[in-house]
Amino acid sequence: RHLGRPVRAGASQAQASRGMSPAGPGAPAARTTGTEALAVVVTAGVTPYLRRTLRSVARQSVEPEAVIVIDVASRHNGLGDGTPVEEVVAASGIDARMRVRVVRAPDARGFGDAVARGLALYSELSGTGTRGPRASSDRPSGAANSKRSRGTTRRRGRVTDREGGNAGSSRASRGGRGWLWLLHDDAAPAPGCLEALLAAVAEARSAALVGPKQVDWDEPEHLLEVGLRTTASARRANDVVAGEIDQGQHDDRSDVLEVGTAGALIDRAVWEELDGTSPEFPVFNDGLELSRAVRLAGHRVVVVPQAVIRHRRASYLGLRPSQGGAPERPAADADPLPSAPWARAADPDPDRSFRARRIAQLTAWATFSGRPIGLLLIWFLILGIARSGVRLLTKSPALARAELGAALTVLRRGGAIRRGRRRLASHATVRRSVLTRLYVHAADIRSVRRDRRRQERERAVRAAAPSELELRELAVLARRRRLSLTGVLLAVVVVA
């Protein structure tokens, strides 16, 4: 059994005409395995990153069972620019290599909710899917959608038994574990990413959630994260220094507290058992909450450094239009569509997302803590006022407002925190102490930050220090000044 779909003759001919293998140039042949993976890509309409992501999925050395592209954009929520996602799907070439379904979930409240809604729509449509190389859409055909028909074909037919089987929740008849491969629109996996993830879960049957090593979108030699640890207060401790070169120094990691949702592979049964991610974490810390829930349910969370994914981190860097940042122009290799008007690229600025990230951290802190919610909320308010004052002293008024605003927002989220606690408790089969050994102490984070600041100061000193050539020139000038001064003194003595 092929890991993904049965390779169609039409797709093979299309690939042969391009002079490449089904997985892309230079990629190894797909393996045979009983494990099935369904790739799920969530996007807010057409973004500058979507095409590269879809191309990367199409070039996997092991193909997914099918690809679901979930579009959460609509006129009502203000997301997207109106460009049909089907155009990018067709332009990326992914629909010529594997089965693609475009579904829409404009009412989704976050990444996890979008995945849940998209899977539900996919299951409903699995009985009337599109057979053939082109991507199918859940929108009805007609004059209103004539523009979209340029990138899609509308032949309707039965989905293969394999695709329909993966759309359902039962996998007993298939004799293997079903997996969901979660992808953001700004997360482009390396050709062997899915293969490495599947190899990891095949070797570690107790692992239910595995994630790849994340590297920079434009400079993949720079590390972003290799799994994450946090304090008990959900404060992240990333051991990777900004700009750190990937030399395999973190490739010995395995069990971690958290893997991000970008590129994560999760057991479909576990995803359904947990009802996906918590709705209280729509954008940030959804991976942390999901990882904790998986751990408490008695499963392992593992990072797979051999699986690599490029991540733009558009939400973190404030590059989403909803965050006040203009969308970036696509990269030179992205071949933007004429119908996609890209604004002038905005400078990445994590401060744009600070308030949302702080709200997520405080919510996660209260959700995972066993302390009384009322006391925690009062402490958050005091902490917010204090941190806001510090921000003002350091001349960061925008961050000061964000600190206080986040504390006031969480102060009104007592009900959401209770629901989050009940959610974790309802699925817990092991003691919370299993997470304790994966925590990092706040003192360790402060120590690491002091070391980083010291290293930055040393780098700044070295950068400002003169080079050897400049030192030699300065020595020559000093020698000339001494000789000149000596000559002047001798002349004065002689005249005197």
What are these regions (language model features)?
Residues 175, 190-230:
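Conserved donor NDP-sugar-binding/catalytic core segment of glycosyltransferases
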Residues 249, 257-276, 280-308, 313-315:
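A short, conserved alpha-helix in the catalytic core of glycosyltransferases
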Residues 296-414:
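Active-site-adjacent helix/loop segment of glycosyltransferases
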Residues 231-256:
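Short, flexible, basic/aromatic active-site loop/helix in glycosyltransferases
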Residues 105-132, 154-175:
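Glycine-rich, basic loop-to-helix element that forms the pyrophosphate-binding segment
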Residues 55-64:
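Short, acidic, metal-binding catalytic loop of nucleotide-sugar glycosyltransferases
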Residues 127, 175-188:
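Short beta-strand-to-loop acidic/aromatic patch adjacent to the donor-nucleotide binding site
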Residues 351, 366-478:
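Non-catalytic, C-terminal membrane-associated alpha-helical segments of glycosyltransferases
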